[in-house]
Regions:
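Thiol-/selenol-based redox modules, centered on thioredoxin-like
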Residues: 92-93, 97-143
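Structural microenvironment flanking redox-active thiols in thiol-disulfide oxidoreductases
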Residues: 18-62, 72-78
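Short, internal strand/loop/helix patches
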Residues: 58-85, 89-91, 97-98
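Short, thiol/selenol-centered motifs that function as redox-active sites or metal-ligating centers
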Residues: 1, 14-28, 47-49, 131-134, ...
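Short active-site neighborhood of thiol/selenol oxidoreductases, capturing the structured segment around
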Residues: 3-23, 42, 112
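Aromatic- and Gly/Pro-enriched helix-to-coil junctions and flexible linker segments
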Residues: 123-232
């Protein structure tokens, strides 16, 4: 989000093939027409669709010119707290805080106006009534360090993150992984690690790619967010 600190607000709304809330889409289009020079506006596919060509075709068919972020792991959607298809988020890229979460028609424009005016903004949260966005978060409510996390570290990280390795620190114990867990979450979410990642959704498949699977990313990030617990 810091990449958009030259804008005074960022507005994000969920989008899915045949599941997008019509009122939300209309409100986002109106916001784009009025604020596109001052506000960054995005649609977010919360892991509902993997076919990017189909998403692009639906946008073109409906004459929508908003960019779509593909949240294949659903993790960004979770962190923004978007749970229904009619909920949008208005984000302040300077303070890194959410100013508004709720239906686009109820308060998004007011939040944008407040940010444009430079006013101090406190979070306004209004429950949406649209279709619930499915999530597998409950499947990872009791992750085991031994069975779920350590194998991912061993397979994808430990070759470099070991004593004498080329990485700046070793992941050679559960305590070390716990201590570095906030950094692990950051570099996994931003895809800086594992190094040399390739967008495997574009072009031909490439052998020996370094990417984590969506499931591995979900487990690591959700484990860290749960406090990085270790099996007793």
């Amino acid at each position: 989000m810091a990449w958009y600190d030259d804008h005074q607000a960022v507005v994000i709304a969920p989008f899915g093939l045949s599941t997008t809330d019509a009122g939300t889409l209309s409100a986002m289009t109106a916001l784009q027409a009025r604020y596109q020079d001052q506000v960054a506006l995005f649609l977010l596919n919360p892991g509902l669709d993997s076919d990017r060509d189909a998403v692009a075709a639906e946008l073109a068919a409906n004459h929508i010119e908003l960019p779509v972020l593909m949240d294949d792991t659903h993790l960004v959607t979770e962190m923004l707290g978007i749970g229904r298809m009619d909920e949008v988020v208005v984000y302040d890229p300077t303070s890194f805080e959410i100013a508004y979460r709720g239906p686009a028609q109820s308060g998004a424009e007011d939040a944008v106006e407040a940010l444009l005016a430079g006013s101090d903004v406190e979070l306004v949260s209004i429950a949406g009534t649209g279709s619930a966005i499915p999530s597998n978060e409950s499947e990872h409510s009791e992750l085991s360090y031994v069975n779920d996390i350590a194998p991912i570290i061993a397979e994808n990280c430990a070759q470099c993150h070991r004593e004498g390795g080329i990485a700046p620190f070793a992941m050679d114990s559960s305590l070390a992984v716990q201590g570095w867990s906030p950094m692990i979450r950051e570099v996994v979410m931003t895809k800086r690690m594992p190094p040399g990642q390739i967008d495997n959704k574009v072009g031909q498949k490439i052998k020996n790619e370094m990417n984590l699977t969506d499931s591995e990313m979900q487990k690591l990030v959700r484990w860290v967010s749960a406090g990085a617990p270790v099996d007793v």
